Protein backbone atom coordinates (compact mmCIF):
# COMPACT_ATOMS: atom_id res chain seq x y z
CA UNK A 1 0.00 0.00 0.00
CA UNK A 2 1.25 3.51 -0.84
CA UNK A 3 0.84 6.26 1.75
CA UNK A 4 1.56 9.75 0.48
CA UNK A 5 0.25 12.04 3.22
CA UNK A 6 0.16 11.67 7.01
CA UNK A 7 -0.10 13.87 10.11
CA UNK A 8 2.14 13.25 13.13
CA UNK A 9 2.86 14.86 16.50
CA UNK A 10 6.39 15.83 17.54
CA UNK A 11 7.79 16.64 20.99
CA UNK A 12 11.43 17.65 21.25
CA UNK A 13 13.29 16.77 24.43
CA UNK A 14 13.25 19.10 27.43
CA UNK A 15 16.55 20.48 28.63
CA UNK A 16 17.99 18.94 31.77
CA UNK A 17 17.64 20.86 35.04
CA UNK A 18 20.51 22.81 36.51
CA UNK A 19 21.16 22.04 40.18
CA UNK A 20 22.00 23.94 43.32
CA UNK A 21 25.19 22.57 44.90
CA UNK A 22 28.28 23.81 46.74
CA UNK A 23 31.92 22.82 46.98
CA UNK A 24 32.53 20.84 50.15
CA UNK A 25 36.15 19.73 49.75
CA UNK A 26 38.50 19.65 52.67
CA UNK A 27 40.68 22.75 52.97
CA UNK A 28 38.25 24.84 50.88
CA UNK A 29 36.49 26.88 53.59
CA UNK A 30 34.69 29.21 51.16
CA UNK A 31 33.94 26.70 48.42
CA UNK A 32 31.16 28.62 46.76
CA UNK A 33 28.54 27.37 44.30
CA UNK A 34 29.25 24.23 42.25
CA UNK A 35 25.95 23.33 40.58
CA UNK A 36 26.31 22.13 36.97
CA UNK A 37 24.10 22.96 34.00
CA UNK A 38 21.57 20.56 32.54
CA UNK A 39 22.17 18.98 29.15
CA UNK A 40 20.42 20.04 25.95
CA UNK A 41 17.25 18.20 25.02
CA UNK A 42 17.13 16.18 21.82
CA UNK A 43 15.78 17.83 18.67
CA UNK A 44 13.52 16.05 16.19
CA UNK A 45 15.39 15.85 12.88
CA UNK A 46 14.10 14.59 9.54
CA UNK A 47 16.63 12.96 7.20
CA UNK A 48 16.21 11.75 3.62
CA UNK A 49 16.84 8.06 2.98
CA UNK A 50 16.84 7.31 -0.74
CA UNK A 51 16.02 3.67 0.01
CA UNK A 52 12.53 4.63 1.21
CA UNK A 53 9.62 5.04 -1.18
CA UNK A 54 6.59 5.61 1.06
CA UNK A 55 5.48 7.16 4.35
CA UNK A 56 4.02 3.85 5.49
CA UNK A 57 6.07 3.71 8.73
CA UNK A 58 4.35 6.88 9.96
CA UNK A 59 0.93 5.32 9.52
CA UNK A 60 1.45 3.03 12.50
CA UNK A 61 3.28 5.46 14.77
CA UNK A 62 1.94 9.01 14.92
CA UNK A 63 3.57 10.37 18.10
CA UNK A 64 7.31 10.95 18.44
CA UNK A 65 8.96 12.17 21.63
CA UNK A 66 12.68 12.94 21.83
CA UNK A 67 14.83 12.34 24.92
CA UNK A 68 15.36 14.79 27.77
CA UNK A 69 18.80 16.19 28.55
CA UNK A 70 20.50 14.92 31.70
CA UNK A 71 20.34 17.03 34.84
CA UNK A 72 23.43 18.86 36.03
CA UNK A 73 25.53 17.46 38.86
CA UNK A 74 27.65 18.79 41.69
CA UNK A 75 31.29 19.80 41.22
CA UNK A 76 30.17 21.92 38.23
CA UNK A 77 29.58 18.80 36.13
CA UNK A 78 27.17 19.45 33.29
CA UNK A 79 24.49 17.00 32.24
CA UNK A 80 24.89 15.08 29.00
CA UNK A 81 23.16 16.39 25.89
CA UNK A 82 20.49 14.04 24.56
CA UNK A 83 20.97 12.51 21.11
CA UNK A 84 18.69 13.90 18.44
CA UNK A 85 15.73 11.82 17.32
CA UNK A 86 16.28 11.23 13.58
CA UNK A 87 13.24 10.26 11.51
CA UNK A 88 13.95 8.85 8.04
CA UNK A 89 11.75 9.95 5.14
CA UNK A 90 11.83 9.24 1.39
CA UNK A 91 13.10 11.81 -1.13
CA UNK A 92 10.42 14.31 -2.10
CA UNK A 93 8.90 14.73 1.38
CA UNK A 94 7.44 18.13 2.22
CA UNK A 95 6.93 18.95 5.92
CA UNK A 96 4.27 21.49 6.92
CA UNK A 97 3.12 22.97 10.22
CA UNK A 98 -0.47 21.75 10.65
CA UNK A 99 -1.56 24.85 12.59
CA UNK A 100 -0.17 27.48 10.21
CA UNK A 101 0.15 25.43 6.99
CA UNK A 102 3.67 26.87 6.71
CA UNK A 103 6.26 24.81 4.82
CA UNK A 104 9.00 23.80 7.25
CA UNK A 105 11.17 21.79 4.88
CA UNK A 106 11.25 20.39 1.35
CA UNK A 107 13.54 17.36 1.47
CA UNK A 108 14.83 16.03 -1.84
CA UNK A 109 18.44 14.80 -1.71
CA UNK A 110 19.74 11.70 0.05
CA UNK A 111 21.17 12.59 3.47
CA UNK A 112 19.54 16.02 3.54
CA UNK A 113 18.44 17.03 7.06
CA UNK A 114 16.05 19.51 8.63
CA UNK A 115 15.54 20.30 12.33
CA UNK A 116 11.78 20.64 12.74
CA UNK A 117 11.34 20.60 16.54
CA UNK A 118 14.23 22.06 18.52
CA UNK A 119 15.29 20.56 21.84
CA UNK A 120 15.18 22.69 24.97
CA UNK A 121 18.23 24.44 26.41
CA UNK A 122 19.63 22.98 29.59
CA UNK A 123 18.87 24.88 32.79
CA UNK A 124 21.75 26.72 34.44
CA UNK A 125 23.23 25.58 37.74
CA UNK A 126 23.62 27.97 40.67
CA UNK A 127 27.29 28.64 39.87
CA UNK A 128 26.10 30.51 36.75
CA UNK A 129 24.30 33.09 38.88
CA UNK A 130 27.19 33.99 41.19
CA UNK A 131 27.88 37.74 41.38
CA UNK A 132 30.01 39.92 43.66
CA UNK A 133 26.83 40.87 45.54
CA UNK A 134 25.63 37.27 45.74
CA UNK A 135 28.67 34.94 45.58
CA UNK A 136 26.73 31.85 46.70
CA UNK A 137 23.29 31.88 45.03
CA UNK A 138 20.96 29.22 46.35
CA UNK A 139 18.81 28.76 43.27
CA UNK A 140 19.17 27.18 39.83
CA UNK A 141 17.18 26.99 36.62
CA UNK A 142 14.95 24.26 35.24
CA UNK A 143 15.50 22.99 31.70
CA UNK A 144 13.73 24.71 28.83
CA UNK A 145 10.82 22.66 27.43
CA UNK A 146 11.38 21.25 23.95
CA UNK A 147 9.26 22.50 21.09
CA UNK A 148 6.02 20.66 20.46
CA UNK A 149 4.00 20.77 17.25
CA UNK A 150 1.90 18.78 14.81
CA UNK A 151 3.22 18.44 11.28
CA UNK A 152 1.96 16.95 8.05
CA UNK A 153 4.25 14.93 5.82
CA UNK A 154 3.42 15.03 2.14
CA UNK A 155 5.30 12.84 -0.34
CA UNK A 156 5.53 14.12 -3.86
CA UNK A 157 6.38 11.08 -5.94
CA UNK A 158 9.84 11.03 -7.47
CA UNK A 159 8.77 8.54 -10.11
CA UNK A 160 10.35 8.88 -13.55
CA UNK A 161 7.10 8.25 -15.39
CA UNK A 162 3.54 9.22 -14.47
CA UNK A 163 0.52 7.53 -16.05
CA UNK A 164 -2.30 10.02 -16.61
CA UNK A 165 -5.71 9.77 -18.17
CA UNK A 166 -9.41 9.52 -17.45
CA UNK A 167 -10.62 6.83 -15.04
CA UNK A 168 -10.76 3.27 -16.43
CA UNK A 169 -8.49 3.82 -19.44
CA UNK A 170 -6.14 1.00 -18.35
CA UNK A 171 -3.41 2.71 -16.32
CA UNK A 172 -3.43 0.20 -13.46
CA UNK A 173 -3.57 -2.73 -15.86
CA UNK A 174 -0.51 -1.42 -17.70
CA UNK A 175 1.46 -1.00 -14.48
CA UNK A 176 0.53 -4.51 -13.33
CA UNK A 177 1.83 -6.18 -16.51
CA UNK A 178 5.09 -4.22 -16.85
CA UNK A 179 6.13 -4.38 -13.18
CA UNK A 180 5.59 -6.42 -10.03
CA UNK A 181 3.25 -3.81 -8.63
CA UNK A 182 -0.24 -5.06 -7.79
CA UNK A 183 -2.59 -2.09 -8.03
CA UNK A 184 -6.30 -2.60 -7.46
CA UNK A 185 -8.05 -3.15 -10.80
CA UNK A 186 -11.81 -3.01 -11.23
CA UNK A 187 -14.51 -2.38 -13.80
CA UNK A 188 -15.57 0.92 -12.27
CA UNK A 189 -14.25 4.48 -12.06
CA UNK A 190 -11.67 5.55 -9.48
CA UNK A 191 -10.49 2.03 -8.65
CA UNK A 192 -7.15 3.74 -7.99
CA UNK A 193 -7.49 6.34 -5.24
CA UNK A 194 -3.85 6.30 -4.09
CA UNK A 195 -0.73 6.28 -6.30
CA UNK A 196 0.97 2.95 -6.98
CA UNK A 197 4.66 2.62 -7.77
CA UNK A 198 6.35 -0.03 -9.87
CA UNK A 199 9.89 -0.59 -11.14
CA UNK A 200 9.80 -1.37 -14.85
CA UNK A 201 12.56 -3.21 -16.75
CA UNK A 202 12.70 -3.11 -20.55
CA UNK A 203 13.80 -6.14 -22.60
CA UNK A 204 17.15 -4.38 -23.22
CA UNK A 205 17.76 -4.09 -19.44
CA UNK A 206 16.91 -0.43 -18.95
CA UNK A 207 14.78 0.40 -15.91
CA UNK A 208 12.67 3.23 -14.53
CA UNK A 209 10.04 3.91 -11.87
CA UNK A 210 6.47 4.24 -13.08
CA UNK A 211 3.57 5.68 -11.07
CA UNK A 212 -0.05 4.76 -11.68
CA UNK A 213 -1.90 7.88 -10.58
CA UNK A 214 -5.60 8.36 -9.76
CA UNK A 215 -7.80 9.12 -12.74
CA UNK A 216 -8.50 12.70 -13.77
CA UNK A 217 -11.84 14.28 -14.58
CA UNK A 218 -12.74 17.67 -15.99
CA UNK A 219 -12.23 20.39 -13.37
CA UNK A 220 -9.41 18.56 -11.59
CA UNK A 221 -7.21 21.66 -11.60
CA UNK A 222 -9.91 23.34 -9.48
CA UNK A 223 -9.92 20.44 -7.04
CA UNK A 224 -12.86 18.49 -8.52
CA UNK A 225 -12.78 14.75 -7.79
CA UNK A 226 -9.27 13.71 -6.79
CA UNK A 227 -7.91 16.78 -8.62
CA UNK A 228 -5.23 18.44 -6.50
CA UNK A 229 -4.50 15.16 -4.75
CA UNK A 230 -3.58 13.72 -8.15
CA UNK A 231 -1.95 16.68 -9.85
CA UNK A 232 0.67 17.36 -7.19
CA UNK A 233 2.17 13.94 -7.97
CA UNK A 234 2.60 14.74 -11.66
CA UNK A 235 4.85 17.73 -10.92
CA UNK A 236 8.02 15.70 -10.34
CA UNK A 237 7.72 13.07 -13.06
CA UNK A 238 10.10 13.45 -15.99
CA UNK A 239 7.84 11.88 -18.62
CA UNK A 240 4.05 11.81 -18.76
CA UNK A 241 2.43 8.76 -20.37
CA UNK A 242 -1.02 9.91 -21.47
CA UNK A 243 -3.33 6.90 -21.85
CA UNK A 244 -6.50 7.17 -23.91
CA UNK A 245 -9.37 4.70 -24.33
CA UNK A 246 -9.41 4.56 -28.11
CA UNK A 247 -12.51 2.34 -28.19
CA UNK A 248 -14.75 5.08 -26.80
CA UNK A 249 -16.39 2.40 -24.64
CA UNK A 250 -17.15 4.91 -21.86
CA UNK A 251 -19.21 7.06 -24.22
CA UNK A 252 -16.49 9.73 -24.57
CA UNK A 253 -14.64 10.84 -27.69
CA UNK A 254 -10.89 10.01 -27.56
CA UNK A 255 -9.89 13.40 -28.95
CA UNK A 256 -11.96 15.18 -26.27
CA UNK A 257 -10.32 13.07 -23.55
CA UNK A 258 -6.92 14.08 -24.89
CA UNK A 259 -7.76 17.79 -24.92
CA UNK A 260 -9.41 17.84 -21.48
CA UNK A 261 -6.51 16.10 -19.72
CA UNK A 262 -3.94 18.43 -21.27
CA UNK A 263 -6.05 21.46 -20.37
CA UNK A 264 -6.22 20.32 -16.74
CA UNK A 265 -2.46 19.74 -16.59
CA UNK A 266 -1.75 23.21 -17.99
CA UNK A 267 -4.32 24.86 -15.72
CA UNK A 268 -2.73 23.35 -12.62
CA UNK A 269 0.88 24.11 -13.56
CA UNK A 270 1.86 25.82 -16.82
CA UNK A 271 5.13 23.88 -17.08
CA UNK A 272 3.28 20.57 -17.22
CA UNK A 273 2.04 21.55 -20.67
CA UNK A 274 5.63 21.37 -21.94
CA UNK A 275 6.60 18.20 -20.05
CA UNK A 276 7.68 15.32 -22.36
CA UNK A 277 4.57 13.29 -23.12
CA UNK A 278 3.93 9.95 -24.79
CA UNK A 279 0.39 9.35 -26.06
CA UNK A 280 -0.82 5.76 -25.74
CA UNK A 281 -3.92 4.51 -27.57
CA UNK A 282 -5.20 1.65 -25.40
CA UNK A 283 -7.92 -0.99 -25.96
CA UNK A 284 -6.94 -1.48 -29.59
CA UNK A 285 -8.35 -5.03 -29.36
CA UNK A 286 -11.91 -3.66 -29.26
CA UNK A 287 -14.14 -2.86 -32.27
CA UNK A 288 -14.05 0.70 -33.65
CA UNK A 289 -10.67 1.39 -31.99
CA UNK A 290 -8.78 1.46 -35.30
CA UNK A 291 -11.27 3.84 -36.92
CA UNK A 292 -11.14 6.08 -33.86
CA UNK A 293 -7.34 6.00 -33.95
CA UNK A 294 -7.28 7.15 -37.57
CA UNK A 295 -9.60 10.06 -36.79
CA UNK A 296 -7.57 10.87 -33.68
CA UNK A 297 -4.31 11.08 -35.63
CA UNK A 298 -5.89 13.32 -38.23
CA UNK A 299 -7.09 15.67 -35.52
CA UNK A 300 -3.86 16.03 -33.52
CA UNK A 301 -1.51 15.95 -36.51
CA UNK A 302 1.68 14.08 -37.32
CA UNK A 303 3.79 16.02 -34.80
CA UNK A 304 2.31 14.01 -31.91
CA UNK A 305 3.33 10.34 -32.13
CA UNK A 306 0.77 7.84 -30.88
CA UNK A 307 1.61 4.30 -29.73
CA UNK A 308 -1.31 1.84 -30.12
CA UNK A 309 -1.42 -0.93 -27.50
CA UNK A 310 -3.73 -3.40 -25.83
CA UNK A 311 -3.14 -4.09 -22.16
CA UNK A 312 -5.44 -7.12 -22.41
CA UNK A 313 -3.68 -8.89 -25.32
CA UNK A 314 -0.37 -7.14 -24.46
CA UNK A 315 0.15 -6.13 -28.09
CA UNK A 316 2.91 -3.54 -28.62
CA UNK A 317 3.75 -3.26 -24.90
CA UNK A 318 7.50 -3.77 -25.47
CA UNK A 319 7.54 -1.00 -28.09
CA UNK A 320 5.87 1.31 -25.57
CA UNK A 321 8.51 0.53 -22.92
CA UNK A 322 11.31 1.20 -25.41
CA UNK A 323 9.74 4.55 -26.30
CA UNK A 324 9.48 5.53 -22.62
CA UNK A 325 13.09 4.52 -21.90
CA UNK A 326 14.29 6.46 -24.95
CA UNK A 327 12.40 9.56 -23.86
CA UNK A 328 13.86 9.33 -20.35
CA UNK A 329 17.38 9.12 -21.77
CA UNK A 330 16.67 12.14 -23.94
CA UNK A 331 15.72 14.20 -20.88
CA UNK A 332 17.97 12.57 -18.26
CA UNK A 333 19.99 15.76 -17.69
CA UNK A 334 16.92 17.96 -17.21
CA UNK A 335 16.02 18.45 -13.54
CA UNK A 336 12.35 19.41 -13.54
CA UNK A 337 12.26 19.37 -9.72
CA UNK A 338 14.89 22.11 -9.39
CA UNK A 339 13.12 24.29 -11.96
CA UNK A 340 9.86 24.05 -10.06
CA UNK A 341 11.45 24.72 -6.70
CA UNK A 342 13.19 27.81 -8.01
CA UNK A 343 10.04 29.03 -9.74
CA UNK A 344 8.10 29.18 -6.50
CA UNK A 345 11.05 30.36 -4.40
CA UNK A 346 11.31 27.21 -2.31
CA UNK A 347 14.67 26.37 -0.81
CA UNK A 348 15.27 22.76 0.05
CA UNK A 349 15.24 23.54 3.75
CA UNK A 350 13.03 26.55 4.19
CA UNK A 351 12.46 26.97 7.85
CA UNK A 352 13.36 25.79 11.32
CA UNK A 353 10.54 26.08 13.79
CA UNK A 354 11.12 29.19 15.92
CA UNK A 355 8.28 30.60 18.02
CA UNK A 356 7.71 34.30 17.59
CA UNK A 357 9.28 36.21 20.47
CA UNK A 358 6.38 38.55 21.13
CA UNK A 359 6.91 40.38 24.41
CA UNK A 360 3.66 39.70 26.28
CA UNK A 361 -0.06 40.36 26.23
CA UNK A 362 -2.48 40.94 29.12
CA UNK A 363 -6.12 39.86 29.10
CA UNK A 364 -8.88 39.31 31.69
CA UNK A 365 -10.57 36.05 32.68
CA UNK A 366 -14.30 35.92 33.44
CA UNK A 367 -13.56 35.95 37.17
CA UNK A 368 -11.61 39.21 36.84
CA UNK A 369 -8.13 37.69 37.07
CA UNK A 370 -5.39 39.13 34.85
CA UNK A 371 -3.81 36.67 32.39
CA UNK A 372 -0.27 37.31 31.13
CA UNK A 373 0.81 35.38 28.03
CA UNK A 374 3.67 35.45 25.54
CA UNK A 375 6.51 33.16 24.50
CA UNK A 376 9.22 34.92 26.50
CA UNK A 377 7.37 35.11 29.83
CA UNK A 378 5.96 31.59 29.45
CA UNK A 379 9.46 30.26 28.74
CA UNK A 380 10.77 31.93 31.92
CA UNK A 381 7.82 30.54 33.90
CA UNK A 382 8.55 26.99 32.75
CA UNK A 383 12.24 27.31 33.61
CA UNK A 384 11.67 28.66 37.14
CA UNK A 385 11.76 26.35 40.16
CA UNK A 386 8.87 27.66 42.26
CA UNK A 387 9.88 25.45 45.17
CA UNK A 388 12.86 27.76 45.67
CA UNK A 389 12.17 31.17 47.23
CA UNK A 390 15.30 32.75 45.66
CA UNK A 391 14.20 31.46 42.23
CA UNK A 392 10.74 32.96 42.76
CA UNK A 393 12.28 36.33 43.69
CA UNK A 394 14.42 36.19 40.53
CA UNK A 395 11.28 35.49 38.45
CA UNK A 396 9.60 38.54 40.02
CA UNK A 397 12.61 40.69 39.10
CA UNK A 398 12.47 39.41 35.52
CA UNK A 399 8.79 40.33 35.28
CA UNK A 400 9.56 43.85 36.49
CA UNK A 401 12.44 44.24 34.03
CA UNK A 402 10.14 43.18 31.17
CA UNK A 403 7.65 45.89 32.16
CA UNK A 404 4.89 43.47 33.14
CA UNK A 405 4.31 45.08 36.56
CA UNK A 406 3.85 48.53 35.01
CA UNK A 407 1.61 47.13 32.28
CA UNK A 408 -0.60 45.44 34.87
CA UNK A 409 -0.95 48.70 36.79
CA UNK A 410 -1.95 50.48 33.57
CA UNK A 411 -4.67 47.86 33.06
CA UNK A 412 -6.01 48.60 36.56
CA UNK A 413 -4.42 45.77 38.52
CA UNK A 414 -4.42 46.55 42.27
CA UNK A 415 -2.79 45.13 45.37
CA UNK A 416 -4.21 41.65 46.06
CA UNK A 417 -5.55 41.01 42.53
CA UNK A 418 -4.92 37.60 40.95
CA UNK A 419 -2.46 37.29 38.04
CA UNK A 420 -2.26 34.06 36.03
CA UNK A 421 0.59 32.77 33.86
CA UNK A 422 -0.04 29.39 32.24
CA UNK A 423 -1.28 27.22 35.14
CA UNK A 424 0.16 29.37 37.93
CA UNK A 425 -1.64 31.98 40.05
CA UNK A 426 0.07 34.91 41.74
CA UNK A 427 -1.11 37.71 43.99
CA UNK A 428 -0.19 41.17 42.80
CA UNK A 429 1.71 42.99 45.56
CA UNK A 430 2.62 46.67 45.43
Swiss-Prot record:
Domain OCT: 352-430
Biological process (GO), any one: ribosome biogenesis
Coiled-coil regions listed: none
The protein's required cofactors: Mg(2+)
Binding site for GTP: 165-172, 190-194, 212-215, 282-285, 310-312
Major site of localization recorded for this protein: cytoplasm
UniProt GO cellular component terms: cytoplasm
Chain positions covered by the region annotation Disordered: 118-145
Domain Obg: 1-158
Binding site for Mg(2+): 172, 192
Family from the record: Belongs to the TRAFAC class OBG-HflX-like GTPase superfamily. OBG GTPase family.
Protein name in the entry: GTPase Obg
Gene name per UniProt: obg
